[in-house]
Amino acid sequence: MAKSQNKESPELRTPNRFITDHDASGLSVFNTSIPDALPAQVIGGRDRFHLAYATTTSPVDLTNQSDIVTYSSFLSTPPGISLPGGSVLRIVDVRPGGESLMHRTESIDYGVVLDGEIDLVLDSGESRILKRGDVAVQRGTNHLWRNRSHTAWGRMVFVTLEAKPIEIDGKLLGGVTGLGMDDTSPAGN
């Protein structure tokens, strides 16, 4: 099979997602009800968000493909950063020199750098450089992501789970947003 490339970023191929399932006899198979190639949603003018999977319950109901039906519905109307009681798996392609707005989400986000080097910057001014394979655990903090390269795209994968509202010294922090969207819309993590 030929390598599928993004026209805007030829160094990053279009990601695929393969969903396993069971046939009528209980044998493990690949589900073919949804195309493997992940569609891209352009956010903030240029960055691309690929919704790899999403669930709305925990534990996840795998009976009668309930989770696949739920995920399929999100392909036409993407979920927000997190889903109440569920999970969101997303691949984010960050343009050269791209930077999100400073934002806070009521979620815990596990982010892994797949390509490039990405800065994770906190509102305190602290920052870390994440290189390929590095992991960030973002715990509802005010933060932004920045691609360190001005010539190459960066790619991260995020698993996002809903979190309880954060309270510090009796005050609720709430979900402060970035990218011009609220916590229930498809913004970055």
From Swiss-Prot:
It comes from the Eukaryota. The keyword NADP does not apply. InterPro entries: Cupin_2, OryJ/VirC-like, RmlC-like_jellyroll, RmlC_Cupin_sf. Keywords: Virulence. Gene3D superfamilies: Jelly Rolls. Pfam families: Cupin_2. PANTHER family: CUPIN TYPE-2 DOMAIN-CONTAINING PROTEIN (PTHR36156:SF2), SLR2101 PROTEIN (PTHR36156). Part of the gene cluster that mediates the biosynthesis of the phomopsins, a group of hexapeptide mycotoxins which infects lupins and causes lupinosis disease in livestock. The role of phomC' within the phomopsins biosynthesis pathway has still to be determined. The pathway starts with the processing of the precursor phomA by several endopeptidases including kexin proteases as well as the cluster-specific S41 family peptidase phomP1 and the oligopeptidase phomG to produce 10 identical copies of the hexapeptide Tyr-Val-Ile-Pro-Ile-Asp. Belongs to the oryJ family. This is Phomopsin biosynthesis cluster protein C'. It comes from Diaporthe leptostromiformis.
